[in-house]
């Protein structure tokens, strides 16, 4: 996919500032990164996945700010946003995202969500269509209908969900050095982890180092995992499927062909079931194309914003005036 006219990358990965930290009071402190961009450009709000953070967008966001304004919040129980009594499941974080949009980014925006963040973005677009001009779904968590994850990935999630066992496993992981934990996640989520830039890895390690000082992170993670699995599997998958079909805004679905968590077959099935969507496959990358292949991801976004997503871009830019 080539970059579209009017939306241009602002630079190469690793050459741009990794966003300015800001805070909003939304029933407690919420951290987000402001990557800048033109004040009159469409606003893209990036929503990370399960166990992720706003740092998941530091490689691709600078490539979008030539034509777009880009923000990325840390959801409750993720990144630097501690739960502080707020729920960390899908429904609670969907509601928190809506509050973020209303408070920090009022008016229709383009939501760009990865994995669980794609699920939350879909649910927000279905629940509050006036708030969402368009969706960019990057390997979103999809219902377990057309395809299931890699058996080893499924076994890992079952281990986390097992009463008592999951708590012990997560406690052990939290005692590991942050760099080792980040490396493990990249091995799971990428086809070639070495493609992820060193400064991007460092940013993720820094986030985990800060999270090591927080309390209650194990319970927060367990609640989030249970909620995601309940939404894509039984009993929630049919309700989630209906919500997906109710989305009326333009949608770009970006998916790595080597994704082990959400197989490419699931994305292809979703695209067939929703023929108005635009599917952009990125060959040979995994679950986090925005980290493993940020240039290809940015090109797919740019091309869509200048073509099928032009109406969404216009609506998300008009809100700025």
Regions found by a protein language model. Give the residues of each.
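Alpha/beta-hydrolase fold nucleophile elbow
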Residues: 105-115
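Conserved HGGG/HGGXW glycine-rich cap/lid loop of the alpha/beta-hydrolase fold
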Residues: 28, 33-82, 291
